[in-house]
Structure formats: structure tokens, C-alpha cells
């Protein structure tokens, strides 16, 4: 089970977007990276294709998982993630507050 999943609210810990929060759009476990909405935005030059015109587009670039942390459900501050067996299900738990992260 992954500690950071698609749809999680995360806080950026280091880099040019330090302190920003966003939602995880995509997780790439093999590369240990994630794409977060509104974070690590880069400009790319786009060549013209049949269905897209040329120009400079902005998009989110992947950020390393070590540079982001899940936002605590209680106060929104960064927290580490632990696991707990709840009945017969394994759930993610915020180490900071003890709240269950999984909906």
C-alpha cells in the first residue's frame, strides 16, 4: 500500500514551491514521483499538431515523493503516514494527529 495516493492533499516541503498545498493528480511509483496540481509548474514549447496549435504551454512537472508530505486532516500541516489494521482493512493514519486518512 502506498503512503501517497492520487487525490491526496499534500504539502510541498522543499524547493521553489515550499509551503504550497495541492492535490495529487498522478503518482509514478517506479520513479518515486508525483504530479501535484498547481505545484512545480513549468513552461513547455509545444510544436503544432493536427489537434493542437503551437505555443508555450504551462503544465505541472513531477516532483519527488521525498519533497512532499500528506496534509494532516485536522490542521492541514504536513504529517508522516503510518498504517493501522482497522477490523480487516489496512488504513493509513496521520502520525501527527492519529486521524485516519482514508475516506
UniProtKB/Swiss-Prot annotation:
SMART domains reported for this sequence: KOW (SM00739)
CDD domains xrefs: KOW_RPL26
Pfam families per UniProt: KOW, ribosomal_L24
Presence of keyword Nucleus: no
UniProt keyword annotation of Cytoplasm present: no
GO cellular component: ribonucleoprotein complex; ribosome
One example GO MF annotation: structural constituent of ribosome
Keyword field: Ribonucleoprotein, Ribosomal protein, RNA-binding, rRNA-binding
Biological process (GO), any one: translation
PROSITE patterns the record matches: RIBOSOMAL_L24
Family: Belongs to the universal ribosomal protein uL24 family.
HAMAP family referenced in this protein's UniProt entry, alphabetically: Ribosomal_uL24_B (MF_01326_B)
Role this protein plays: One of two assembly initiator proteins, it binds directly to the 5'-end of the 23S rRNA, where it nucleates assembly of the 50S subunit.
Subunit description: Part of the 50S ribosomal subunit.
Protein name, UniProt field: Large ribosomal subunit protein uL24
Organism per entry: Sinorhizobium medicae (strain WSM419) (Ensifer medicae)
Gene name, Swiss-Prot/TrEMBL: rplX
